[in-house]
Amino acid sequence: MQLLTDFLHQETEIEKQQKKTGSFVPDFSEMKTQAPHLTNDLFFHNRDIYISKHNRYAPYPLHSHQFLELNYIYSGHCQQIINGQTYTLYQGDILLMDVGSKHQIECLEEEDIVINLLFKDNNISLQSLEEMQGNNSLLYHLLLSRHSHLEISQNFIILRSEEIPKVPQLLHRMIEEYFFQKDFSQEILKHSLSILLYELARSLPNAQKKILQ
């Protein structure tokens, strides 16, 4: 665990530049355009899951995705503007965003470690999602909205740390497998993703955090 924490706190080259200037340094050429739309081709080269750390020390501009995105606050806190509204996330919180969600991230400081977990839509089994707490599952509606005629008022979910007590340990294992590759790491990541989705579905309250109107 300490090895992973030390690794994530190491400053990347982009972070070093942003720390000096306080200005955003694009990590992809597509980010140089206004409100860019990031596509699958940028991330999923012969892999099913993409995990990265958000670069600190400068705001990350407004952008949208062509894939499902999970933000995990590994340490510290994070302020994001999602679809025009500001939210603050703290250590252990998760933000799950559907395809087309637009968000920007305020400047992260030294102790603010935010992890991105991106996965292709076609890697999620429709059959397994149908079993996730039935049709009342908010996660089910969120992930399947493109495959049905459902209309949702928002296309993201925030889960607080107290609602997902078992998820951090699972995510830490996935992050370790991703950055410290060993035999069968890719297979472990694939299966861990399914378990992660079930844990998230289990944690979703039935009535308190409705996103469907």
Task: Say what each PLM segment does.
Residues 13, 32-33, 44-45, 51-54, ...:
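Short amphipathic alpha-helical segments, especially helix-boundary/capping motifs
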Residues 46-140, 146-148, 182-186:
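N-terminal regulatory/effector-sensing and dimerization cores
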